[in-house]
């Protein structure tokens, strides 16, 4: 077993060796290095063919038509293109948008920008388990609601929303439905032929592909229109200009192909490991799982260890790579806004650790993690006067702390 142990697969994944090998054939003079937009020679044709194959591999995983796949620089750009693109195109029909408070910043900040442009956004609060109440969603829909954006799997707590039911509510209201599926693609069965999803954001590096490339699914029937946010040579049917990075696209395609092939065997394996981790940690006093355990990614476990500061715990866990909050926002000292939206107090939100398992996680690593966690929590609580007070039966909420 090699230390440190990587348990932060929701932040990024290593590139699968098979993917890296495939990508290498599209970089040098001996490889297929052409510009897919070069229509006058073999170098361009070969590159275009490679892009087409990757487009089909991505479409195959999600039950889409390859013509519905638009390549972007990543899921953040896909979210921006979907939300701004649809809002701007359909603004004559209305200016109301619905989203949820636990969405990724790429969705929330894009909605904030649209508010500055005169759009109105309803931010739904999830239930305590992280799920959206469908009745509340239905009640938020209005005749002028042009767009709803709800993520499939949450990046912090791994909770899976019922995108089938939400999509049907949107379709009945003639509202465009965007899903951020960055965390769920390749981990959960998605068949867009059966879902009323109009736009779907995807990433490559969350599924063992390279960083710097992603895709947006744009439905053809019923056709969804977008206003471009990057202008230029009219690539990607005018929706996203810019020379296509063939090696990255090929890598993403190969990663999606592997995921389709191995998903049925890999997800039960990860669920068994995740449950092993949970069973090993749940007996620690004052630990709380964040988010529904029933409707959740098999690879995610988010636990709050009360009376332990999350940052101190992470420092004590030098041999394990985990995160306390989303990788995109963990640079700030604010407690996780996702956990706050579930109703957790600052202390519990600050004491949360996200474990996300992946393709290279082993049983040995999980057992090592359990032992290390138990020791670290015990050690830090031994240093905590709050823990002593709690053990003495003092209700800490009744204490008035003096301000400094």
Swiss-Prot record:
It comes from the Bacteria. The modification N6-(pyridoxal phosphate)lysine is found at residue 206. Pathway: Cofactor biosynthesis; iron-sulfur cluster biosynthesis. GO terms for cellular component: L-cysteine desulfurase complex. The keyword Magnesium does not apply. Its main location: cytoplasm. One of its GO terms (biological process) is [2Fe-2S] cluster assembly. One of its GO terms (molecular function) is metal ion binding. [2Fe-2S] cluster binds at residue 328. The active site is at 328 (cysteine persulfide intermediate). Homodimer. Forms a heterotetramer with IscU, interacts with other sulfur acceptors. Master enzyme that delivers sulfur to a number of partners involved in Fe-S cluster assembly, tRNA modification or cofactor biosynthesis. Catalyzes the removal of elemental sulfur atoms from cysteine to produce alanine. Functions as a sulfur delivery protein for Fe-S cluster synthesis onto IscU, an Fe-S scaffold assembly protein, as well as other S acceptor proteins. PANTHER family: CYSTEINE DESULFURASE, CYSTEINE DESULFURYLASE FAMILY MEMBER. This is Cysteine desulfurase IscS. It comes from Haemophilus influenzae (strain ATCC 51907 / DSM 11121 / KW20 / Rd). The gene is iscS.
């Amino acid at each position: 077993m090699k230390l440190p142990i990587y348990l932060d697969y929701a932040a990024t994944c290593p590139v699968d060796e098979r993917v890296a090998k495939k990508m290498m054939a599209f970089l040098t003079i001996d490889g297929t290095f052409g510009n897919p937009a070069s229509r006058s020679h073999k170098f361009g044709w070969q590159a275009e063919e490679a892009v087409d194959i990757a487009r089909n591999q991505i479409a195959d995983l999600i039950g889409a038509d390859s013509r519905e796949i638009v390549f972007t620089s990543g899921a953040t750009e896909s979210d921006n293109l979907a939300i701004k693109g649809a809002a701007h195109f359909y603004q004559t029909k209305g200016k109301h948008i619905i989203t949820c408070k636990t969405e990724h910043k790429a969705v929330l900040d894009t909605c904030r920008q649209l508010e500055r442009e005169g759009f109105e956004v309803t931010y739904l609060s999830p239930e305590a388990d992280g799920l959206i109440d469908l009745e509340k969603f239905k009640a938020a829909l209005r005749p002028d609601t042009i767009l709803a954006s709800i993520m499939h799997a949450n990046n912090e707590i791994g909770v899976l929303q019922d995108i089938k039911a939400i999509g049907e509510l949107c379709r009945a209201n003639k509202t465009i439905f965007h899903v951020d599926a960055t965390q769920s693609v390749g981990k959960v069965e998605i068949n867009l032929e059966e879902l009323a999803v109009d736009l779907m954001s995807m990433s490559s590096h969350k599924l063992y592909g390279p960083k710097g490339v992603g895709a947006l699914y744009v439905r053809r029937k019923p056709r969804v229109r977008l206003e471009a946010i990057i202008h230029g040579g009219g690539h990607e049917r005018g929706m996203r200009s810019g020379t296509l990075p063939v090696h990255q696209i090929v890598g993403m395609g190969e990663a999606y192909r592997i995921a389709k092939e191995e998903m049925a065997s890999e997800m039960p394996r990860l669920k068994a490991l995740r449950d092993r981790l949970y069973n090993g940690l749940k007996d620690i006093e004052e630990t709380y799982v964040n988010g529904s355990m029933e409707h959740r990614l098999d690879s995610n476990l988010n636990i709050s260890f009360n009376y332990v500061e999350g940052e101190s715990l992470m420092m004590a866990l030098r041999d394990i790579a985990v995160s306390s909050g989303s990788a995109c926002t963990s640079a700030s000292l604010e407690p996780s806004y996702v956990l706050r939206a579930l109703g957790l107090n600052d202390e519990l939100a600050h004491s949360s650790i996200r474990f996300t398992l992946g393709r290279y996680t082993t049983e040995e690593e999980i057992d090592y993690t359990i032992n290390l966690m138990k020791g670290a929590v015990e050690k830090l609580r031994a240093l905590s006067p709050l823990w002593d007070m709690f053990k003495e039966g003092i209700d800490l909420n009744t204490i008035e702390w003096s301000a400094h």
